[in-house]
Amino acid sequence: MTIAPEGRRMLRVEARNSQTPIETKPRWIRNQVKNGPEYKDMKERVAGASLHTVCQEAGCPNIHECWESREATFLIGGANCSRRCDFCMINSARPEPLDRGEPLRVAESVREMRLNYSTITGVTRDDLPDEGAWLYSEVVRKIHELNPNTGVENLVPDFSGKRDLLQEVFESRPEVFAHNLETVPRIFKRIRPAFRYDRSLDVIRQARDFGLVTKSNLILGMGETREEISEALRDLHSAGTDIITITQYLRPGPLFHPIERWVKPEEFLELSDEAYEIGFAAVMSGPLVRSSYRAGKLYAQALKFRGEELPANLSHLAETTEGPTTQEASSLLERYGASEDAPVIPRG
């Protein structure tokens, strides 16, 4: 029996993963830190009101840039997830009882932080009869109620593909409905054993048919091939995905899936061009891009592509579309120049 650092028995997959040492990062996996006035104001507000955001608690490398645009992400549903994905650092265990006061608290946090755009994500709640559909819906409703000038992106699990539960979430009408596919069919079951590739695509398809702006994410470096990435992009577009983010897998610790390869900025740039050629409305592609990174900018860009104007109450988001972002592959190549070969090397 193998014991995890916190004293519990390791899962077999964790024991296998732990045999591969943590990998050394290539030179382009680093972040620029700029503390602008909006970031400083947000930081003071968060500290003063003892607020909690994923941005801080997950140590997101993009916190300075997103907060400068007054965008932030919140995790709902508790600290424990009812499923386990091999790339995700959220604890997999029996979830806590449902906290019905959480939606109001999140909405009040959004108000205190004076956000332009908020992303809601959370754990799966297979323990609940509605799998958390009310919770994901209610937090959108409360944010809209208390913050009419704040956009809301709802990044949700699949609710087992149940149409009635998805319909409840759709009817809360977030500005963007997001469900992350994450990886390609061949390795999907190994990486996300409790999810299904086709079911995730169907979730996006249902959201598109409802009339929502849709979004998904692909994580690279977990064993997929270049051809498989292209196939997944085509599948996502066919399912009705408007916005796609593409990112490098960064291993949270030794119990998680080893990194199979470091994807160069040049390949991320190629994938961005390819995604636009396929027909996506908005694309963000780079090693340190995360699915909620500069989400307001992508929403505004997607509406423009669709020939729609920003709602009057969100017209301020038009300002976020100007200029490149720090983590786009094109920006990395500008800063660091052409990348060198970077094989996956265990940290010595």
From Swiss-Prot:
PROSITE patterns on file: RADICAL_SAM
GO molecular function: 4 iron, 4 sulfur cluster binding; lipoate synthase activity; metal ion binding
Pathway named in the protein's UniProt entry: Protein modification; protein lipoylation via endogenous pathway; protein N(6)-(lipoyl)lysine from octanoyl-[acyl-carrier-protein]: step 2/2
InterPro entries: Aldolase_TIM, Elp3/MiaA/NifB-like_rSAM, Lipoyl_synth, rSAM
Keyword hit for Cell inner membrane: no
Predominant place of localization: cytoplasm
Keyword Plastid appears in the UniProt entry: no
Subcellular location: Cytoplasm
CDD domains in the cross-refs: Radical_SAM (cd01335)
PANTHER family with a match to the protein in the record: LIPOYL SYNTHASE, LIPOYL SYNTHASE, MITOCHONDRIAL
Protein name: Lipoyl synthase
UniProt organism field: Corynebacterium efficiens (strain DSM 44549 / YS-314 / AJ 12310 / JCM 11189 / NBRC 100395)
